Amino acid sequence: QVEVAVKTFWGDLYHRMPKPEIGSVGYTFAESEVRHHDAYAHLLDLLGLNDEFTKIDQIPALKERVDYLTLSAKLAKTEEDRDYALSVLLFSLFIEHVSLFSQFLIIMSFNKHKNLFKGMSNAIEATSKEEQIHGLFGIDLVNIIREENPEWFDDRMAEDVYTACRLSYESEEKVIDWIYEKGDLDFLPKQTVKEFVKHRLNNSLESVGY
C-alpha cells in the first residue's frame, strides 16, 4: 500500500512542479519504487511471510504505521502550494529517509553478525541506497522551495513538522517493539535501533533548517 503511494507521489511531482528536470527525476524515482515493491514482495516470499502479510490489519503497530504513512502521502493531493510544500517535506524526511530503515538495519545485522540472509542483505543494501537518494533529492527540493517562498516556513509550518516528526518516531518505535517482542538481540539491542531512528529523524530535520 505504502509503496503504491510512494510511486504515485514521485510520478505526480511534475504536475505540481512543471519543470522538465523535476519531471525526469520524479518518473525515474517512480520506476525505482516499482522495483522496490517487487523486491519487498520477493523478500516476503523468501521469508515465507505472505500469509502473515494478509494479517497486517490485525497487528496494531503495523496497521498504525501504514495508516500514518498513507495519510502523509495523501497530503500531496492538496490544492494549496504551501501545503504541498509541507507534503514534500514530510514525505522526503519521514517516509523516504526514515521509514523502513530500522528494518533494513535489523536484517543486515543478521548478515553481518550471524552470516544469515546474505542475498536479502544485498537487495536491501541496494534498495536503501536508492531510498536515501530519494530522500536527499526531496530535501534539496524543500530547501529550494524555502528560498523561493520563505513566508511559508513560519511558526505554523514548524509546529506541523515537529508534530509529524513525533508521530513518525512513535510509529517507528511501536514497529520496533513489535519486532523485538520475543526478546532482544545481543548483537543489535532494541534501544540501539531506536537511537538509530532518532538520529535519522534529527539529521532529517536539521537538513531542512529545523
Predicted feature locations:
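Non-heme di-metal
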Residues: Q1-Y210
